[in-house]
Amino acid sequence: MTIADDIMDLMKRKRRLRLTARDISEILYWGDETYRQRVATACLMLHDQGSLARSGTGNAADPFTYRMHRGERSR
């Protein structure tokens, strides 16, 4: 299972939440800092593929938050 698969599984379970990449990393990998950048990269990839919707400006005051794209169905 890849990091992207882990993220999608989490987001399918937490459909109503908007989570930052940091939140996702802490939930999935118990705050292990080594995963933070890989999770952020995977979130960007999933957003570019249309699997995750993103909001926010990406700065410290308004970080990107991710949620399931409305068109994505659970499998």
Name what the model sees in each region:
Residues 1-13, 17, 33, 71-75:
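Short alpha-helical segments that sit at the start of domains
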Residues 5, 21-22, 40-43:
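Short amphipathic alpha-helical segments
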Residues 10, 27, 42-45:
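Alpha-helical recognition domains of nuclear gene-regulatory proteins
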Residues 17-28:
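Short acidic, hydrophobic short linear motifs in intrinsically disordered regions
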Residues 21, 35, 56-57:
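Residue-level detector of family-conserved "landmark" positions at structurally sensitive sites
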Residues 33-48:
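Short amphipathic alpha-helical interaction segments
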Residues 47-57:
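A short, conserved structural fragment
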Residues 57-75:
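Short, cationic-aromatic polyanion-contact patches
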